[in-house]
Amino acid sequence: EETVDVQGLPFSTLTLDFVKDGRAVMSWHTEPDEIRPIPDAAEAALLPEQIKTVEQLFLTGLHLEQYRHATYSPVDYYEEGLRRDPDDVRCNNAMGLWYIRKGRFDVAGQYLEKAVKILQKRNPTPYDGEPVYNLGLALKYQGRYEEAYNRFYKATWNGGWQDAGYFACAQISCMNGDY
């Protein structure tokens, strides 16, 4: 333990270095005293019918979910997107996830089955495995473990879903005593 007298020094000039065996292991310094501008206030979302594209409907719904907006529902934006384009994979996946979070796994499965069917129409190993993984979740929560396992395994084709997919497969294997 060491005490250092810094009395009389301006706070903004302080730097503290912890050194062990000649090597810095931690360093701290003050932030400059500056008044930063306040960021602009967030703009209110347009109503779903005022938004021009399905992509913007999806992105607005995603934003509302991410920030848990108190007065707007993301579902309104996803549903409007699906009204305009029932085959939009993003909105079908988003609705499926929303219903998973609400415990409505059967309804979630309907949206996710559609998303996966559209994704795999021309490419059995789609670019993004998220809807495939999410369908696995909906099936697992319905107790349809063999189908869920197959979906989780299929989702591992995509690098972004390998960890979660293999882990979910391992969970089901352990439940079945298949170590």
Regions found by a protein language model. Give the residues of each.
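Long, contiguous interaction/recruitment modules in multidomain scaffold/adaptor proteins
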Residues: 1-52
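Residue-level recognition of tetratricopeptide repeat
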Residues: 62-63, 97, 137, 171
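Structural motif corresponding to the intra-repeat A-B loop/turn of tetratricopeptide repeats
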Residues: 67-68, 102, 142, 176
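Structural marker of alpha-solenoid helical repeat scaffolds
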Residues: 84, 118-124, 158
